[in-house]
């Protein structure tokens, strides 16, 4: 499986939804809290050009925000 990374903050509702989705589907992921880690925040801005969270990276694909259908497709999960 491609590596999964989420750039998030502790108070972001959609970040929490994404992390619950990963747990539900047993998807291992690396989390960076951009609210407390300025280096990772800069990395996120360099990748996306903006500060909105969550930013989810699956391999080389990046999506800003959390839409279950989009992330499922990125992960190759069945949506049925």
Where are these regions (language model features)?
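Residue-level detector of anion-binding/catalytic polar loops
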Residues: 28
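Ser/Thr-centric signal marking residues that sit
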Residues: 5-9, 48, 53
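Short, flexible helix/strand-to-coil boundary loops that buttress conserved ligand/catalytic motifs
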Residues: 19, 67, 75
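Glycine-/small-residue-rich active-site loops that bind phosphorylated ligands and cofactors
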Residues: 13, 36, 63
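Thioredoxin-like thiol-disulfide oxidoreductase module
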Residues: 33-50, 69, 77
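A short, hydrophobic beta-strand/beta-hairpin element that forms part of a small beta-sheet core
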Residues: 54-63
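Extracytoplasmic thiol/disulfide redox context detector
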Residues: 1-5, 75, 80
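Local sequence-structure signature of Cys/Sec-based thiol-disulfide redox active-site neighborhoods
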Residues: 1-25
């Amino acid at each position: 499986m491609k590596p999964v990374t989420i750039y998030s903050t502790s108070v972001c509702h959609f970040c929490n939804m994404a992390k619950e989705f990963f747990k539900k589907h047993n998807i291992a992921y690396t989390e960076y809290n951009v609210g407390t880690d300025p280096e990772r925040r800069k990395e996120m801005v360099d990748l996306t050009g903006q500060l909105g969270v969550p930013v989810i990276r699956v391999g080389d694909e990046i999506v800003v925000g959390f839409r279950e259908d989009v992330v499922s497709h990125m992960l190759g999960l069945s949506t049925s």
